[in-house]
Amino acid sequence: MRSPGGILLQALPRLLQHAALPGLAELPARWALPRGAGGDGPADRLPRGGGASAAAAAAAASGALLGAYLERHGPPEASELPEPGGALAGGPGSGGGGVVVGVAEVRNWRCCCLGSTCWCRSLVLVCVLAALCFASLALVRRYLHHLLLWVESLDSLLGVLLFVVGFIVVSFPCGWGYIVLNVAAGYLYGFVLGMGLMMVGVLIGTFIAHVVCKRLLTAWVAARIQSSEKLSAVIRVVEGGSGLKVVALARLTPIPFGLQNAVFSITDLSLPNYLMASSVGLLPTQLLNSYLGTTLRTMEDVIAEQSVSGYFVFCLQIIISIGLMFYVVHRAQVELNAAIVACEMELKSSLVKGNQPNTSGSSFYNKRTLTFSGGGINVV
């Protein structure tokens, strides 16, 4: 990354050239000389010749500024200087836009902590999710307390049926509350029984949502997917040779559970393979959510605020669970993006060679048009 000093050295001569000195095209090249190569001071590196008094004053001011910078920081590195004849030097191909490039570089200079791969973002996101979880619990704890007490007072079979109905509802595109049901199942029935209830309920809900969306909502889902580049990319990869792997990885991403069921319903994956891949992909988050539910221990300790130590352990376990879940989701996103890129390259190579891409006979794929935009493949 270029330092602010190097960027200043690049932008200053061009700014002066546009402001007062139209004949300073060779200025950056002369400044690029090391100390002592073209003279003993910055004044020897300035162009000699005529010019108005205002131009001479501007040149003297720029030379003094550069001399002070060089005396304090030393000569700039070669990587910080413009290429001979480049955009900032006003050479061929500059097109008069050198100053715009320099100013853009100055504006775009920022701390590396704002990068997408910085661990600071992960830490901040984990803290925000934990705070939202605690805030939600504080806001709805009274209603949640009564609801959990009511479910716990029901007959065991009736409670299980209620959870299954809940999983069926959240399996549709407009449903919400999948994670809440997972945590509630682990809280009420424990880790083992809660896991079993989750797996059975999710399997039934996924099956029903898949069949209903495939037979009744295909046109609606296809219209929504065509407006989303991310979902279209997932569909393209699913219709390739690694469809089951992509289904399993997509289950670990933040894409809503019901929306994923609708997206996968318009593909040509066989129903048994689809259900198996979905079950495998959902297993890690189900384990984490069930464990998170069991850490609530009892309603009296956490909801009624009767145990300070219980709150401390609960907060620590929630932070660890959310951090682990974030790591799993991040790794799944990396793998899914890699699979999407590989599929894009395969499709692009097939189109360049004049071959028909492998679409597994998908009817949805035949309704779309592949176009080249910016060197990539977009779905329109």
Swiss-Prot record:
UniProt keyword Endoplasmic reticulum, yes or no: yes
Membrane-topology descriptor: Multi-pass membrane protein
Positions in coiled-coil regions: none
Pfam (any one): VTT_dom
A GO biological-process term: positive regulation of fat cell differentiation
Region of interest (VTT domain), residue spans: 186-296
Keyword Membrane: yes
Subcellular location: Membrane; Endoplasmic reticulum
Residues that span the membrane, as ranges: 50-70, 84-104, 120-140, 160-180, 188-208, 308-328
GO CC entries: endoplasmic reticulum; membrane
Keywords from the named record: Endoplasmic reticulum, Membrane, Transmembrane, Transmembrane helix
Quaternary structure and partners: Interacts with ATP2A2.
Its job: Positively regulates TNFSF11-induced osteoclast differentiation. Acts as a regulator of TNFSF11-mediated Ca(2+) signaling pathways via its interaction with SERCA2 which is critical for the TNFSF11-induced CREB1 activation and mitochondrial ROS generation necessary for proper osteoclast generation. Association between TMEM64 and SERCA2 in the ER leads to cytosolic Ca (2+) spiking for activation of NFATC1 and production of mitochondrial ROS, thereby triggering Ca (2+) signaling cascades that promote osteoclast differentiation and activation.
Domain-related comment: The VTT domain was previously called the SNARE-assoc domain. As there is no evidence that this domain associates with SNARE proteins, it was renamed as VMP1, TMEM41, and TVP38 (VTT) domain.
Family recorded in the similarity comment: Belongs to the TVP38/TMEM64 family.
Name of the protein in its database record: Transmembrane protein 64
Name of the gene this protein is made from: TMEM64
